[in-house]
Amino acid sequence: MKKIVLLSLSVFAAFSLSAQQPRDWAQYGRYERQNAALAGEPVEVVFMGNSITDNWIGADPDFFARNGFVDRGISGQTTAEMLARFRRDVIDLNPKAVVILAGINDIAQNNGAIKLENVFGNIVSMCDLARYNGIKVVLCSLLPCDRFS
């Protein structure tokens, strides 16, 4: 009987511990190594955004390197996820400017329905954080769309 109880407790504990593994919801770790490599290096501009931004560097990586540009786009990200990682992927790099392209995945409801005023608030918060830290903001407009598939 003791063995059954101990075995049951062990199985229960294993399930409980595995259920508590943290999920990297905002993909904080995506650029961890690259950010560490930039410590102390001058950064002119950080590009913060979604898949569109994520793919810009692929067009001409040398252009980014030559000009002190850093790409911190992550495909599929919403403004809430970008805001969550804004300190790590923008402010901590101490750029002169940040280019923000955000909101399209909120409209596509990648994380479920969201009110437009919340999307706006997330974008305003990123802008406020940047300005507070002496970083100029370039805010891009959303691309036009009428449906998502």
Which residues does each PLM region occupy?
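Alpha-helical cap/lid subdomain in secreted, periplasmic
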Residues: 61-68, 81-149
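Intrinsic structural disorder
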Residues: 1, 50, 146-148
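Bacterial Sec-dependent N-terminal signal peptides
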Residues: 1-20
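Serine-esterase "nucleophile elbow" of acetyl-processing enzymes
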Residues: 19-99
